[in-house]
Swiss-Prot record:
Protein name: Nicotinamide-nucleotide adenylyltransferase
Family, similarity comment: Belongs to the archaeal NMN adenylyltransferase family.
Keywords per UniProt: ATP-binding, Cytoplasm, NAD, Nucleotide-binding, Nucleotidyltransferase, Pyridine nucleotide biosynthesis, Transferase
Species lineage: Archaea, Methanobacteriati, Methanobacteriota, Stenosarchaea group, Methanomicrobia
MF-aspect GO terms: ATP binding; nicotinamide-nucleotide adenylyltransferase activity
Pathway(s) the chain acts in: Cofactor biosynthesis; NAD(+) biosynthesis; NAD(+) from nicotinamide D-ribonucleotide: step 1/1
Entry EC number(s): 2.7.7.1
GO terms under biological process: NAD biosynthetic process
PANTHER family: BIFUNCTIONAL NMN ADENYLYLTRANSFERASE_NUDIX HYDROLASE, PHOSPHOPANTETHEINE ADENYLYLTRANSFERASE
UniProt xrefs under InterPro entries: Cyt_trans-like, NMN_Atrans_arc, Rossmann-like_a/b/a_fold
Top-level taxon of origin: Archaea
Amino acid sequence: MGRAFYIGRFQPYHYGHQSVLKRIAETADEIIIGIGSAQLSHEVNNPFTAGERVLMITRALAHLDCPYYVIPIEDIQRNALWVAHVRSMTPPFDRVYSSNPLVVRLFAEVGISVESPSMYERETHCGTAIRELMLNGEPWEDRVPPAVVSVIREIDGVERLQQIAGSD
């Protein structure tokens, strides 16, 4: 079974991520969840801090029947070194789950097994669509687990996103 690695920006964490992690939990002994672009926040495409994303994921997965670690991973500007950077920040793992073509390629080049899970209702359950709903003041809460709704409300996440998207 082994230890699996799954990386995403989780801006915000949503049911698409939840679906993939539940499937990974069926075959893994442990899961490492990497919060990619951890240094980014307070931007339209990256409104939430790494700590806020840790909170979203941890609360949403409270009942997951598989041990997991949530680890923020900052970007580096050299793709050829990125896998080594990830490995230096995480416990060892033997399997990667990602649908990102660059992530798939980089891990495959160093001989790590990569699986590309299909995303749950990708068109509606993606961070871009959810942030767009938030920006437009439209309902978004049905796209994320209730625990994530609570975190976003607790941090005034929608107001933050709308404010940073405003123009002077």
